[in-house]
Amino acid sequence: MSCLRSVFLLLAALLAAAAAFAQDYTAGAIKVSKVWTREVPGGAKVAAGFMTVTNTGKVPDTLIGGSIPFAAKFEVHEMKMDAGIMRMRRLEPGLVIKPGETVVLKPGSFHLMFIDLTQAPKRGTPVKGTVIFEKAGRIDVEYKVEPVGARDLGGGHGHH
């Protein structure tokens, strides 16, 4: 067992090194990729986080929260059209990712809310944070900061 464990740990370390390079993060059956946020005007009290989450396992898992250094609160939200009105609500306990499913957190859909900001994300300065899953646990991630109005990672062509 201990020999297997050390091989596993070595593999895990190698995978982690590769993942950091590719900006993919895994824990258990959960894979997180394309992690980003947008610049917000100075003085803004909220910012949003986006990412792609894949559940490679056989059971559902739930994105229940996380943290980012410059926000007092971190919530999982959903935006959707309801009778022609865009409504945003907090998901309790969180966002369920079904087995084999990939969920994209993006503007106008599911997203993370960073609330009560002490400082604003700045373009070109990646921000480290964590996301927490009910089963997979805590995953350390790094958010790439895109310009205001970006619709996706590396988009940067949003209209103002």
Sequence positions of predicted segments:
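Compact, glycine-rich, soluble single-domain proteins
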Residues: 23-160
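Bacterial N-terminal signal peptides that target proteins for export
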Residues: 1-9
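Cleavable N-terminal signal peptides
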Residues: 9-10, 20
